[in-house]
């Protein structure tokens, strides 16, 4: 989502180019206003065969109702990115610095959730002083949680930790 965030698309594009330089197996799809994204790419050194720009005509801002924006702005950079995440075999993840509410609402409405999981959770991975990582599941995104939600968060956090190579995660 090249248009999400206070400093988009400039900082998003710079971050995408940096990620490409750090991971030679990575490919990036930037969704957003193509002329603006291309202008930000000018003068940057990157492998053009690993970066695609998909033009979108709309942007979701932090001032909008997340649900209304996701439902009405079908050609927004976030909704198009979510659609690609769900439908495009080669798209495996999504990064957005935009509205957290819109990202979570969009993920729920456009991508769906694992059967049996009642609500999504934000899960940042933080570096530790010893060089490892710690996951903080939900990170305060849900103010009103029931016991079942906390159990689901624990299950999702465990699954995420295992994808990061942790053999026996502790919650």
Give short role names for the model-derived ranges.
Residues 135-171:
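Ligand-binding beta-strand-loop-alpha-helix segment within the catalytic cores
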Residues 80-87, 119-127, 157-161:
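Short, charged beta->alpha transition segments
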Residues 26-28, 110, 122, 153-154:
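Short, charged/polar low-complexity linear motifs in solvent-exposed/disordered segments
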Residues 93, 104-140:
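Short, acidic/small-residue loops that bind anionic groups at enzyme active sites
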Residues 1-108, 162-171:
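Contiguous, glycine/small-aliphatic-enriched amphipathic segments in soluble metabolic enzymes
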Residues 1-2, 110-113, 143-147:
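Acidic/glycine-enriched edge-of-secondary-structure segments
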Residues 75, 98, 116, 129, ...:
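Short, amphipathic alpha-helical segments
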Residues 14, 101, 120, 124, ...:
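Residues on a specific face of well-ordered alpha-helices
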